[in-house]
């Protein structure tokens, strides 16, 4: 049975990752995590600039890291992470208690 991944489901899993796991927020730290090989999953918001999006997709494909295109703006991605600022990209380093890596 395939579980349907909804936006609310992703947001609750992101909140659990932020509480129990490790994640980096922001473009520079996401690129650094991809280059180091510590990133397991990368989230990119809808309104991320095209140049940055293509660069992250390029490095993630070289490192064979999964990418999830978040359905929402950078404000919504930051809010889903429990932060009060905008976040266009994020990388999950350790999922913690969340099963977000299994649903991708």
Curated annotation (Swiss-Prot):
It comes from the Eukaryota. One of its GO terms (molecular function) is RNA binding. Gene3D superfamilies: 3.30.1330.30. The keyword Ribosomal protein applies. PROSITE patterns: RIBOSOMAL_L30E_2 (PS00993). Keywords: Ribonucleoprotein, Ribosomal protein. GO terms for cellular component: ribonucleoprotein complex; ribosome. The keyword Membrane does not apply. Belongs to the eukaryotic ribosomal protein eL30 family. This is Large ribosomal subunit protein eL30. It comes from Tetrahymena thermophila (strain SB210). The lineage of its organism: Eukaryota, Sar, Alveolata, Ciliophora, Intramacronucleata.
